[in-house]
Amino acid sequence: RVALSAEFDLNDVVTEMLPNSYTVAARIPEGAPQSRPIMRAHKAREQGVVTMTIVQPSTPLASLATIPFTHERVLISTGSRSGLTISVAVHSSRLGQALGGARMWQYENWTDAVADSLRLSAAMTLKNAAAGLNRGGGKSVIHLPIGTVLTDAQKRDAMLDLGDAIESLGGVYMTAEDVGTSAEMMAIVAERTDHVCGLPADRGGVGEPADATAAGVYASIRSTLFALFGSEDVAGRHFVISGLGQVGGRLASMLASAGAELTVTDVNLAKKDFALLLGARWVDVADAHRVRADLFVPCGLGGVLTDQVIGELGSRAVVGAANNQLANHDGARELDARGILWAPDFVVNAGGVIYLDMASRPDADQKVIDARVATIGDTVTKIFEDARELGITTLEAAERLAAARLDATV
């Protein structure tokens, strides 16, 4: 976060209206940080002028040069309808058809979107293997230039283009919703390929997996509490939730209903109303990790656990739904050195893929699915025990668990 604020006439910027705020893309004045920040405008004033808080990302996006390339195949294409760059990365199909969501997000360069697809698809290989699924790892990412706001027609074109790209791979990869997409958008993808899941129930699909993802995180939280305090009871425990989207919002409601003390935040200031409804304390995004609490629960975008954040963490443990929480692999050792217990994200947030995989089967049984998602907590407990007994980090323990399944197929 940088101490910059400025006033712009709304006619000079690209804006998207949100309930109590604006998302604004504008030219940064000379002397501002060189990398493009994310800007949140708030307190709309008269005569179309807003005051903006400028939030500077603390770490750069992963670049192609820093991503280990161990992937089976990567398809990079330009959508014939949308003109957008689409990257579909298949990291591994050793355990079965690769499964991973479709992300549509703003990046400075199209190569950043490709790098994200490589990073995220590799994480999906670990996630699906650790979850015990007969699925490989893949991910698709659609690059939106910074400041781009798509119309409904343009979103439809992008989804049709994504469907064409996936279909061209011949069934090695199946997609689903992710950040920037939805179950309804997956129904559009399905017009061009059968290799998509998580469509709305009224379109013959199994719906969004957010409930299952939140349930898996909740089970992981209970296991983490037991490791710390000898009790899984969340009542009276203090949680800091960063990100109140589909999963974070559901999780916050679950914890509040169970009697937890909550401190919450989100980049969307309209979420303050939701926080008030829960009886939660609101804190600024940049300060959330410093709050003294039992657990820090990141549920937004990845890369949140930077060296600086780890050094400033005020919680005894980190358990959250966000993907790729560690800004770098060594972050697991830094957390361990500080005595902070970290539940590896690709294990914790596997409830969604478990649901999509099992609910898509002809013999799907919701009770069986719920029971399977609940076992995520048992997996987290095993990871904690293995890490302690072997003197390794929880990340290494989780990677060993996933590798054991992958190696068994060789």
Regions found by a protein language model. Give the residues of each.
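Glycine-rich phosphate/diphosphate-binding loop of Rossmann-like nucleotide-binding domains
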Residues: 208-293
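Predominant activation on well-ordered alpha-helical scaffold segments within soluble catalytic domains
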Residues: 114-121, 156-163, 167, 186-190, ...
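Short, intrinsically disordered or compositionally biased N-terminal tails of bacterial proteins
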Residues: 5-31, 36-45, 49-51
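N-terminal ligand-binding/catalytic initiation module
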Residues: 40, 48-203
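Flexible, glycine/charged-enriched surface loops at secondary-structure junctions
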Residues: 128-133, 170-178, 229-238, 387-399
